[in-house]
Every structure is written in C-alpha cells, then in structure tokens.
A protein has these predicted regions:
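N-terminal targeting signals for Sec/Tat export/insertion, comprising classic cleavable signal peptides
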Residues: 2-30
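Gram-negative and organellar
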Residues: 1-3, 7-8, 22, 36-39, ...
Length: 652
C-alpha cells in the first residue's frame, strides 16, 4: 500500500491501481485498498466505476471522499456530453442527466466542503453552456462573484462563450482576457477573444489576432522522433475564423479564396464545406450555397451550420415552405439556440405582412430664377404606400397600393392620385403580380389603370423581368396636365455576378394617348473599387438613350433624340453597427455629358447624401438629400430634393 501511494505521488495511477487490485484479490474487505482503488479510478477518468464502488460501501468513504467522487462523476458526464452523439435526438442526454444529478446532490446531500460545493456550481456552468442556457450561465457566474468566490480560470472561456451567445461581446472580452492572464497561450480562448473583438467592430485588434493564430499554427506539426506530422485541428479552426473575419471586414473575395484552397485539400470535411457555403451566401449566391450545404450534409447529416445555411438559402430563394420544413427539426433539436431563434423570427417576418412607405419632395429652378421649364415642375413630390398580406398557401399575397404624385407647373398643380388592389405570386424562380387601380384626381377621375409585372430568376447572377402599365404613374405629369395619359411596356435584365458588382439594362416604351411614342434604353452599374471594414468605395456608371416616334410638337418635354452618360463614385461609411442594428451614411457623386437634339451636349453634375438605418427587426429606414444641375431644352436648372424610404417585413 505504501508503494501504491508513492506511485500515486508520481502520477503513475495505473501502476498504483494494479497494486490495489492485487490487495483486494487477496482480501476483498480491505477498506483502505477499496477506497483508494475507487479514488484512483476517478483520477484515471473512470468516475462512474468509482461512484459505483462508493455506492456499494458508502460508509467506507469519508464525507470528503464521497463528495469528491460524486463531483468527479458529474464532471465526467459533462465532459462526455461534448462528444458528438450517435443519435441526434439524444444530443443533450448526458448534459441533462448531469444537471439532474447536480440538482439532486444540492437538494439531498449538499457538499459540506467549500471547494466541492464551489466545484459543483462551477461545473454546472459548463453543462448549462452546453445546453445553451446562456442566461443561467451568466447569472450563476455573477452569483459566484457576488459571494466573493474566485471562479477557476478553466471555466472562464465557457462564461465568455455564453456572454457571446447573449450578444454581450464587451463583457465577454473582459472575461476572456482574465482567462488569458492565467493561460496566455490557450488557443480556444484566443479564438473566442477574436470573435468578441470582431462583434464589437474592433477589426484593428481582431484581424491581427486571427492572422497570427493562423500563421503560428502549423498544419502538420511533428513531434520529436516522429516519422510524420499529425493533423492540427487548431490550424483548421484558425483558418475558418480568419475567413469569417475577412468576410465580416468586407473582403468576401479573400475569404472565398482561402476556403476554396482548403476545400481542395479536404473536400470531404463537412464543416469546411458549410463554412464555404456561408461565404457564397454572403457573396449573393444562394443557389450555390444551397448546393454546397447539401454536399456538407451528405458528409454529415447533422452538421448544424449546413442545416441552418439550407434554411437561409431556401428563404432567400423564396421557397419558404422548404425553409420551414428544414427548420422545424433543427429547432426541435436545438430549442435554446439563440441564433436559431433569430433565424425563425426572420422566417416569420418573411411570411408575414410586408409594408413599404416612401416619400420624395423636390424643387427645380433655372439659372435666371424665373419659372423653371423642368418637366418635373417647379415643385414636385410623390408618396407611395405598399402593403401586402401574410402568405396565403405559401405563395400568394393580397396587396394594396396608394400613390400620390404631384408637380407645380407655374401656377397649376397637376396630381395623379391613385389606389390599387391586386395579388402577388412569388415562389422559387417566378415572381408575378397583377394590380388594378383607379385614379382619384380631377385630371383623370375614375380612370382605370392596370399593372402587370413578371420576373424570372435564371441563376444567382441573372434575373429578368417584364412590366406592363396602363395610365402609368411614371408617365409625364406635364402631359397629364393636358389630359394626356401614358401606357408603358418594359423589360429589364440584371446581372449580379457577386457582392462587388451589379449591372442592369432596361428598355421601356411609353405610349401616350395623343399617339406619341417614346423609347428609352438605360444601362446602370456599380463595381467595387476598394473596401475596408467600415468603408466601401464603388465606381458608378450610367448611360441612357431616348427617342420620340416623330417630330410632332407636343405640350410636354419630348426631345426627338436624347442621351446621357455619367460616371462617379459611391462612398458607404458604416458609422455604427451592432449585430442587426446599423447606421450608414452614403455619398454619391457623378458627372457626365448629356445630349439633346437641337441643343447639343453639356456636362451635368449630381450629388446625393443619405443616411441608412437597419433597425434590427428586418426593417430599414433611409433618407437623404440630392442636388443636380440638369439641362432641358438648352436651359440649365438646379434641382434639390429630399426623399425618405421605410420598409418593414420585406419588400412587397
């Protein structure tokens, strides 16, 4: 027995266990050997066997020994609970049993030793974190601190993780830095700290940390004397984190390249495929992300990130029934997951009411400060309200529109006020809406208007649409002043290869009731020029060409030929952001020549400044001012404008 104690002191527990076994074979009633065998089993990680031995002869153990073995058993159950379960339906079986045991011990035989009582409460923090009961983790941690109990460093990363789950990254940072004071080289704690900094928008600190972690983790480290290296999964985690950080810093292209390189090395890694799918989704490729997540789920049907990625992709591809079907079992398996709760809320918003309200007001004056000849009028404005019902049959909505457009032409105010009712079908690739409206103003009272729109998504990059209108509200109010209305037919093709580039070509013909026809062709696009975590710089380009059917004289702006080209830049600056809440300011400046037949060409500058708010519940508010110096019939004018736009629940 003395030799066994010496071996235990040398951390040679297996050799000590062999001695206790020999003693017990000779004398099964040897209490000393029996208790020390149980304690040694617990030291070796076999806490369940130790507990079973203690339950057979509890009076052979001291109170301290009983408490230690019980707590070891609970701790071991919590440790095993972190392993991937064979059956996902029993994912939390060990965790829940551990929490039941903690409650039973505290209720029936609370530890008398201060350390064992503290240890039980500390270990329960890990179990609660596994169960994603983050509020309980933080509350219990704060209770320990309030009692003056020093929480062991090994559990501080768990507390930090729960604070991150509650979206309290500043507090998480403080806890994680405290943990690193005790173990500055701990990889997982440093990784969590990087995420905490990232979620505070501290890219200046987060990016160097992620870069350093990736650079210092060898992919195949080799121990002394080994013939080959071993897999370093910390390097894998560092690469995933670095790609995530680059994406958050508006460098999706770099994140995509990094993960594609890793996928080429390990294509059968489900977590890696799911990570790349999330980057593809952020780049505006939901179909590609859906396909890659399907690959990940083929490799691992329980991969959580891939499953939630499928829900997001199906939602954005307007397949809400499939998204809901995928989400239901995921939500059941992870009932306390805060991220999934937010994903579920986004699905409900997408299925619910959708409202859009916009208002614009402007004024135009010419250089001589006399009455402007602008086709928009001296003063002009518009108000639009769109509302659509929750989904009916997973595809249909019923909607209404109310619109008021007006303009002052010298001493006359011309108005087009209308009310519309219709239906909207949207599912998968097809988007069709049909509305009927009635004019409510004196210029065309009780005039019936129709609007039909159809769109088709060819791929992640290509989208085409057709539009047909009678009594088009976008037709000239100058013409409406003389009782002339305009119908229109148009087509558009949009190409969005990624999150950095967007181009659209539109063709439209206006057919006025006086027999006049106007054809218009517009090309517009933007291309990312430079990006940083909080500033985006895009190049802008626009070109247009229009023509009238003939040279007839009309009482509204109708140039025989006109064209324009403009180029400029757009600067987006993220002034403040906290998860789904954000404030951005945007400045756009363009300049280019415009041509009108009979009047030659001149250069036209324009500028606009806007504020954009993301309000956290799927709604968005933007407002701004604009300035330009357009030319009509050879006369230069100055236009000033203000506009406001609010969307709630999605885009009608």
């Amino acid at each position: 027995m003395q030799q066994a104690e010496q071996l235990r002191g040398q951390q040679r527990h297996a050799d000590a266990l062999a001695i206790y076994e020999r003693v017990l074979r000779a004398n099964p009633r040897d209490r000393g050997a029996y208790t020390m065998r149980a304690i040694t089993l617990s030291d070796l990680g076999s806490a369940q066997l130790a507990a079973e031995a203690m339950w057979r002869h509890p009076d052979w153990f001291s109170q301290q020994e009983r408490e230690r073995i019980e707590n070891d058993r609970v701790a071991r159950m919590i440790g095993w609970a972190s392993a991937e379960p064979i059956d996902a339906a029993h994912r939390y079986a060990e965790t829940d049993q551990a929490l039941v045991n903690v409650a039973r011990i505290e209720r029936e035989s609370p530890p008398t030793l201060t350390w064992e009582a503290t240890r039980l409460r500390v270990d329960s923090l890990v179990a609660l974190n596994q169960r994603q009961r983050h509020r309980d983790v933080v509350a219990n941690y704060q209770a320990l601190k309030a009692e003056g109990i020093e929480v062991p460093a090994y559990v501080l990363p768990t507390v930090g993780d729960s604070l991150m789950g509650l979206r309290r990254p500043a507090e998480a940072e403080a806890v994680l830095r405290q943990a690193l004071q005790h173990n500055p080289d701990d990889f997982n704690t440093q990784l969590l700290l990087g995420y905490a900094l990232l979620e505070q928008e501290r890219f200046d600190l987060a990016m160097p940390l992620f870069e350093r972690l990736a650079a210092t983790q060898a992919p195949w480290p080799r121990r002394n004397g080994a013939s080959s290296g071993y897999e370093n999964w910390d390097r894998f985690s560092a690469d995933i984190a670095l790609a995530t950080a680059r994406s958050a810093a508006n460098h999706n292209r770099d994140a995509d390249a990094l993960l594609r390189e890793r996928v080429a090395i390990g294509p059968d890694n489900a977590e890696l495929q799911a990570a790349l799918a999330s980057i593809e989704f952020r780049r505006g490729h939901p179909s590609a992300a859906l396909q890659r997540n399907a690959m990940a789920l083929t490799l691992d049907p329980h991969q959580k990130q891939a499953r939630s990625g499928v829900v997001e992709a199906q939602r954005d591809l307007d397949r809400l029934d499939l998204a809901a079907a995928t989400f239901a079992p995921l939500r059941k398996e992870y009932p306390d997951d805060a991220g999934l709760q937010r994903l579920g809320a986004s699905l409900e918003r997408q299925r619910g009411w959708q409202v859009h309200l916009s208002h614009a007001r402007g004024r135009s004056d010419n250089d001589t400060l006399t009455n402007s000849t602008s086709p928009l009028g001296n003063d002009f404005g518009s108000t639009l309200l769109e509302a659509e019902s929750p989904l009916l049959g997973e595809r249909w909505r019923v909607g209404l529109r109310a619109r008021d457009d007006w303009a002052d032409f010298q001493d006359t105010r011309v108005r087009y006020r209308s009310f519309w009712l219709g239906t909207h079908y949207r599912y998968d690739r097809l988007d069709v809406s049909a509305y009927g409206g009635r004019a409510l103003d004196e210029f065309d009272r009780d005039g019936t208007a129709w609007a039909l729109d159809a769109g088709w998504r060819f791929s992640d990059a290509w989208y085409g649409s057709l539009a047909w209108r009678t009594r088009d509200p976008d037709a000239s109010l100058q013409a409406r002043r003389f009782g002339i209305t305009g119908d229109s037919i148009g087509a558009a093709l949009r190409w969005t290869p990624n999150d950095e580039s967007r181009w659209e070509l539109q063709a439209r013909q206006l057919r006025y009731s006086d027999g006049n026809r106007r054809d218009q062709l517009d090309l517009s696009g933007s291309q990312r020029l430079w990006a940083s975590p909080h500033v985006l710089l895009d190049g802008l380009f626009a070109a247009s060409a229009g023509r009238a059917k003939d040279d007839r004289a009309v009482n509204y702006f109708n140039p025989r030929r006109n064209s324009a080209v403009a180029a400029g830049v757009r600067i987006d600056q993220i002034g403040w952001r906290r998860y789904d809440y954000a404030f951005r300011q945007r400045l756009e400046v363009t300049v280019g020549p415009t041509y009108q037949s009979g009047f030659g060409s001149q250069w036209v500058p324009s500028a606009a400044y806007r504020h954009l708010w993301s309000l956290g519940d799927g709604s968005a508010l933007s407002y701004g001012v604009s300035w330009s110096r357009p030319i009509y019939d050879g006369r230069r004018e100055q236009q000033l404008g203000f506009d406001l736009d609010f969307r709630w629940g999605g885009t009608p």
